[in-house]
């Protein structure tokens, strides 16, 4: 795997994940209490023995840069390993921003070409899954493909949201359609049992969806980008073009948990699914294939007379006499007496506040970090460093689906209340 370079696409402005992307790039959005989205593809690469990685971003990349530089020093073992962020930049040849996935790679192809590698692994920075890329790349090599696309078997309902592939029995891609509907969708069905699915599973999931993960052979990638300078997107333009001109395209079927965390609803569900018993769909408890993140050296969490069920609590948290059910709490979370948290995601804090600091804040009419006394929070996301006052109710009482209240420090997306980073919600507020 030393002859593979990974390119992780950080995504655009992250409008579908707004307001979580208000102050950070999409790959830097916190996940599962202590990780960030970018930790998933990077950990998959490290576990697959791929140690050369570039992360392409163009929006709010400060916290992402900080996280990566503090977490991944892959050259310490005297190899050539690195994780480097490449932000969109203007040059005389390309005065514009990244205009799509393929355009982002094209703008930096001068840098990627300098590396003496055989394959380029193109990954997405906003997906939750565990995958051994070495199997994927070996499949690409053994089939003699020019381009291999990772494919996920899906049912008809899910299929409408993806680019779909129709393949022959050897997995060679014959046709590619972007988000087909109706009869156009039915024509894309394939017998997925020949890719290792059981007969029952194959019947339920007869479509192969593109996961947005690709392996390109070196010459194929640069030739496609060079010959088609107006093509901006891999899925919509570059792959159909490669198919049309007769390149050898193969699919690699991945039949395991995979979730695209592109929207607030999907992000919320994916986080809370981690609390499922007895086995969550995705687990961070895997010694063979761990997910890495920044070591923070925090003390253990302290729970005082609390009732907690089906929840995940990040380290360095202090929970007083509260009731927490089916929730995920991030590092350094503070929850005071008589608080009820249900079906919620608290991202925690970036720093501690001492007891004396909290007392002084209260005296001056301020609100300390965390969730104040007597507050009820249901079906909500509280971003980092949120200060929720006492006797606050955050339950979306009017069952609003979408709302923007930036002046009050919150938004509602998919019926979920999202309190923004560093927001202060005064005592007695009802949302």
UniProtKB/Swiss-Prot annotation:
Homotetramer. The lineage of its organism: Bacteria, Bacillati, Cyanobacteriota, Cyanophyceae, Synechococcales. The gene is glgC. It holds the Pfam family LbH_GLGC. One of its GO terms (cellular component) is carboxysome. Its EC number is 2.7.7.27. Alpha-D-glucose 1-phosphate binds at residues 163, 178-179, 210. One of its GO terms (molecular function) is ATP binding. One of its GO terms (biological process) is glycogen biosynthetic process. This is Glucose-1-phosphate adenylyltransferase. It catalyses: alpha-D-glucose 1-phosphate + ATP + H(+) = ADP-alpha-D-glucose + diphosphate. CDD domains: ADP_Glucose_PP (cd02508), LbH_G1P_AT_C (cd04651). Pathway: Glycan biosynthesis; glycogen biosynthesis. Disulfide bonds: none annotated. SUPFAM superfamilies: Nucleotide-diphospho-sugar transferases, Trimeric LpxA-like enzymes. Involved in the biosynthesis of ADP-glucose, a building block required for the elongation reactions to produce glycogen. Catalyzes the reaction between ATP and alpha-D-glucose 1-phosphate (G1P) to produce pyrophosphate and ADP-Glc. Belongs to the bacterial/plant glucose-1-phosphate adenylyltransferase family. It comes from Synechococcus sp. (strain WH7803). Keywords: ATP-binding, Carbohydrate metabolism, Glycogen biosynthesis, Glycogen metabolism, Nucleotide-binding, Nucleotidyltransferase, Transferase.
């Amino acid at each position: 795997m030393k002859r593979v370079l990974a390119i992780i696409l950080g995504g655009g402005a992250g409008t579908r994940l707004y307001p979580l992307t208000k102050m950070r790039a999409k790959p830097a959005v916190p996940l599962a209490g202590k990780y960030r989205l970018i930790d998933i593809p990077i950990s998959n690469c490290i576990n697959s023995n791929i140690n050369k990685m570039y992360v392409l971003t163009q929006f709010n990349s400060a916290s992402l840069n900080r996280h990566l530089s503090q977490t991944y020093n892959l050259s310490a073992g005297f190899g050539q390993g690195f994780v480097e962020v490449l932000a969109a930049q203007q040059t005389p040849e390309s005065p514009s921003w990244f205009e799509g996935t393929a355009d982002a790679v094209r703008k930096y192809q001068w840098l990627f070409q300098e590396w003496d590698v055989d394959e380029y692994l193109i990954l997405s920075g906003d997906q939750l899954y565990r995958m051994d890329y070495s199997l994927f790349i070996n499949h690409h090599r053994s089939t003699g493909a020019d381009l291999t696309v990772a494919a996920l078997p899906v049912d008809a309902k899910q299929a409408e949201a993806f680019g779909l592939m129709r393949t022959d029995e050897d997995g060679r891609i014959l046709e590619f359609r972007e988000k087909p509907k109706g009869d156009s969708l039915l024509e894309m069905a394939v017998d997925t049992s020949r890719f290792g699915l059981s007969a029952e599973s194959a019947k339920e999931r007869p479509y192969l969806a593109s996961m947005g993960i690709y392996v390109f052979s070196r010459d194929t990638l640069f030739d496609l980008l060079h010959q088609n300078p107006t093509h901006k997107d891999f899925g919509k333009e570059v792959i159909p073009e490669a198919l049309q001109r007769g390149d050898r395209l193969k699919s690699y079927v991945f039949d395991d948990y995979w979730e695209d965390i592109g929207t607030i609803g999907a992000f919320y569900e994916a986080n809370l699914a981690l609390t499922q018993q007895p086995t969550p769909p995705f687990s961070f408890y895997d010694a063979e294939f761990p997910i890495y993140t920044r070591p923070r050296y925090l003390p253990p969490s302290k729970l005082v007379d609390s009732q907690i069920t089906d929840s995940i609590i990040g380290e360095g948290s202090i929970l007083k006499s509260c009731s927490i059910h089916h929730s995920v709490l991030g590092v350094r979370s503070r929850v005071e007496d008589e608080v009820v948290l249900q079906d919620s995601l608290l991202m925690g804090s970036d720093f501690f506040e001492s007891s004396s600091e909290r007392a002084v804040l209260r005296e001056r009419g301020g609100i300390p970090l965390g969730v104040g006394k007597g507050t009820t929070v249901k079906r909500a996301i509280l971003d980092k460093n949120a200060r929720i006052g006492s006797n606050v109710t955050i339950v979306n009482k009017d069952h609003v689906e979408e709302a923007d209240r930036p002046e009050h420090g919150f938004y509602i997306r998919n019926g979920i209340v999202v309190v923004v980073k560093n927001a202060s919600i005064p005592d007695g507020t009802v949302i």
